[in-house]
């Protein structure tokens, strides 16, 4: 009887440690307001007052995977993107964040459901209808329709036979299917 009590006590202690560890590792509630607040803290750890005026522009789950993408803007600066992972407690943690270097950025993202092509960007002019990415090391092209919103996050599952989903040559297309990559880039530079 005493051994059973000890084993039960040990089991409870281990369970408490595991739950506490998971809560510490995945502190973000799965909602836009909580993600925005944690991004503010994450992006400006080194700022003097510890605050940031980050505005969350888009927040999406990649298919039915454990991965979420947050697209945010910082006034007077460029946009940024963060990758968040979900723990078994349904809470999130920030894996990585980066400032976007282009009007539309392409990347590959690995999830528990496979590898996805990821487009994050801005479409303030509303001229971008589609975005294409031709993989450099494979003969595969991703073609995605761009929504008529200022900011967007798009993803598409990459077939498992593709070994090198990054890098890719990205092309922005208008309604007529014409390449407007340079035009949109120049227009963005003039707006800034």
Where are these regions (language model features)?
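Ser/Thr-rich low-complexity repeats and stalk/linker segments
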Residues: 130-192
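Short, Lys/Arg-enriched, disordered terminal segments
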Residues: 1-9, 35-39, 178-184, 189-192
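Exposed beta-strand-loop-beta-strand "reactive/processing" segments of non-cytosolic proteins
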Residues: 51-86, 180
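Short edge beta-strand/loop segments characteristic of extracellular beta-sandwich folds
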Residues: 116-126
């Amino acid at each position: 009887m005493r051994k059973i009590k000890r084993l039960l006590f040990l089991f409870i202690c281990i369970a408490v440690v595991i739950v506490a560890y998971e809560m510490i590792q995945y502190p973000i509630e799965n909602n836009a307001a909580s993600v925005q607040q944690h991004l503010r803290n994450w992006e400006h750890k080194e700022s003097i007052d510890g605050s940031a005026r980050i505005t969350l522009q888009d927040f999406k789950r990649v298919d039915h995977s454990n991965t979420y993408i947050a697209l945010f803007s910082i006034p007077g600066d460029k946009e940024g993107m963060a990758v968040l992972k979900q723990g078994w407690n349904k809470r999130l943690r920030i894996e990585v964040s980066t400032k976007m270097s282009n009007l539309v950025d392409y990347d590959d993202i690995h999830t528990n459901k496979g590898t996805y092509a990821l487009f994050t960007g801005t479409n303030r002019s509303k001229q971008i209808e589609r975005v294409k990415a031709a993989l450099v090391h494979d003969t595969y092209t991703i073609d995605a329709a761009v929504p008529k919103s200022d900011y967007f996050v798009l993803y598409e599952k990459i077939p498992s036979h593709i070994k090198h989903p990054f890098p890719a040559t990205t092309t922005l297309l208008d309604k007529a299917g014409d390449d407007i990559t340079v035009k949109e880039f120049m227009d963005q530079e003039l707006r800034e």
